[in-house]
């Protein structure tokens, strides 16, 4: 196939992550993302290398016989969901098959192990407790939009007023915010021009308590930046801004006094909403970073407080706008219950006199789950804010046998005097650094648990562990993200006798 060629084919299978294998009528194999087994699709070839072709999806010519589920009206346009048109059981089959194939390839005949059936999320819809919506426009110089990125686009935004993976409170807050800033004619931050005010809307809602935090993330751009320039340069900038305002009705700049009025008005709009949950805090965060990420460069509380509480497996957690916390609270209970069952098995006292390392511990959720049944837990996490949150939450739950250390696992392991009896691994998507994995293996613990959000990384690290004297006892997937391509996997390993 040639780059730029347009063709059609049938999707035979989907490999992780989101790689549809399409066979053309001429028998050629092409990888096309965002497809579902059984579909017939048209695509444009955008990459050919060493005989392997990749294509960009143009159109679903014929739906798959499996696609029988209702979808939100943004499905296919929004980049959030891929499998929403499939019944949930079909989604689970695809994810389990993908992971099983990777694990089988990694392990081969090195050991006998048990692959348990995938565990589903308690909720398939309205399961997310956090959303980061982006401001932008759906097309160049179009009306202000607030929502998710269009599939395959870094710039275009789809207003997702019908989003199904969040509940009605998220949608109400999103639409009220969008209507308010459209009315005020405020411009969004343009990533290429590096101008504008509105960046993101962060909404968090606790599933168990119903408490809500809303945080508006903006730049600090205003007329003050213009006044600091030399007269000639200032005149040019002012002229450009005025021209932009003429082209774009919502391109208003924001000075300090106007910002106070603007934020006060937005706060009042939110407080007037009739929500199922309880609004605990309305916040404003400043972020002048060039990167298109939610970053905290200073947060102001406009109403209430900057935290709320969520409950997980009988534990209580204080969560701020930027705390790391699993985005599916009920699914997290399934994930951590699975890990605890793998660890304890039929012996609830097996850790009673043991020290556990929780490596890549985040805010210490797993550590606190194990603390009541072991002698001591040592958590290691590179993000200092997460470590502080872990300490605060452990105190909140009256767990005094937890120690949390900030730093890179590779370096921090050299500073811990007490050796582990058991190790829990929950690394980021890219898995464990090879040198850190060597140090972990050298402890020689009898058992380890590996929790992975990216099965390709898990498969790679399992190959190293198998080569260094460990065997895999059992593996189980947990679906934390219904309607998407993502899946968590838990693996239990033991030292070869």
Where are these regions (language model features)?
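Flexible loop/N-cap segments at domain edges
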Residues: 201
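Short, acidic/hydrophobic/Gly-rich beta-strand patch recurrent on exposed beta strands
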Residues: 20-25, 147-150, 215-217, 390
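Nucleotide donor/acceptor-binding cores
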Residues: 129, 210-212, 353-354
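Extended interfacial segments that mediate partner engagement and assembly in macromolecular machines
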Residues: 61-70, 79-188, 208
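Rossmann-like S-adenosyl-L-methionine
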Residues: 2-8, 14-17, 219-497
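Structural signature of eukaryotic scaffold interfaces centered on beta-propeller domains
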Residues: 204-206
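Terminal RNA-binding accessory module
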Residues: 1-74, 151, 403, 411
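Short, conserved phosphate/pyrophosphate- and ester-handling motifs at nucleotide-, phospho-/glycolipid
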Residues: 38, 166, 328
């Amino acid at each position: 196939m040639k780059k730029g060629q347009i063709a059609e084919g049938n999707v035979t299978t989907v490999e992780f992550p989101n790689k549809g294998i399409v066979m053309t009528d001429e028998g050629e194999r092409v990888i096309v993302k965002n497809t579902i087994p059984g579909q017939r699709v048209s695509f444009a070839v955008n990459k050919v290398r060493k005989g392997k072709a990749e294509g960009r999806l143009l159109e679903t010519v014929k739906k798959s016989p499996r696609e029988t589920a209702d979808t939100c009206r943004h499905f296919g346009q929004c980049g959030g969901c891929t499998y929403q048109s499939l019944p949930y059981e079909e989604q689970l089959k695809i994810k389990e098959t993908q992971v099983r194939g990777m694990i089988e390839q990694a392990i081969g005949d090195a050991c006998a192990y048990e692959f348990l059936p995938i565990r589903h999320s308690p909720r398939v819809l309205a399961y997310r407790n956090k959303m980061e919506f982006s401001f932008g426009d759906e097309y160049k110089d179009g009306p202000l939009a607030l929502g998710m990125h269009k599939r395959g686009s870094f710039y275009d935004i789809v207003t997702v007023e019908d989003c199904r993976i969040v509940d009605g409170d998220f949608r109400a807050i999103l639409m009220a915010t969008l209507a308010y800033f459209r009315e005020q004619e405020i411009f969004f931050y343009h990533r290429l021009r590096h101008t504008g005010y509105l960046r993101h809307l962060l909404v968090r809602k606790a599933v168990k308590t119903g408490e809500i935090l809303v945080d508006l993330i903006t730049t600090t751009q205003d007329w003050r930046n213009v006044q600091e320039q030399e007269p000639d340069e200032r005149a040019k900038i002012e002229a450009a801004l005025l021209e932009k305002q003429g082209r774009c009705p919502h391109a208003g700049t924001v000075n300090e006094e106007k910002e106070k009025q603007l934020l006060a008005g937005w706060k009042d709009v939110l407080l007037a909403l009739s929500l199922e949950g309880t609004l605990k805090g309305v916040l404003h965060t400043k972020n002048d970073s060039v990167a298109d990420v939610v970053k905290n460069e200073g947060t102001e509380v406009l109403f209430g407080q900057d935290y709320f509480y969520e409950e997980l497996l009988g534990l209580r957690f204080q969560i701020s706008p930027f705390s790391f916390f699993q985005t599916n609270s009920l699914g997290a209970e399934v994930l951590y219950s699975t890990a605890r069952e793998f660890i304890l098995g039929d012996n609830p006292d097996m850790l009673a006199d043991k020290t556990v390392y929780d490596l890549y511990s985040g805010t210490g959720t797993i550590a606190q789950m194990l603390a009541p049944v072991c002698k001591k837990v040592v958590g290691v996490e590179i993000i200092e804010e997460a470590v502080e949150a872990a300490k605060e939450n452990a105190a909140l739950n009256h767990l005094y046998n937890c120690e949390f250390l900030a730093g890179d696992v590779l370096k921090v392991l050299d500073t811990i005097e007490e050796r582990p009896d058991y190790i829990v691994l929950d690394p980021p998507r890219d898995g464990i650094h090879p040198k850190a994995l060597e140090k972990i293996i050298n402890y020689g613990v009898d058992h380890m648990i590996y929790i992975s959000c990216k099965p390709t990384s898990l498969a790679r690290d399992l190959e190293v562990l198998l080569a260094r004297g460990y065997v895999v006892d059992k593996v189980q997937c947990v679906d934390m993200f219904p309607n998407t391509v993502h899946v968590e996997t838990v693996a239990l390993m033991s030292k070869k006798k």
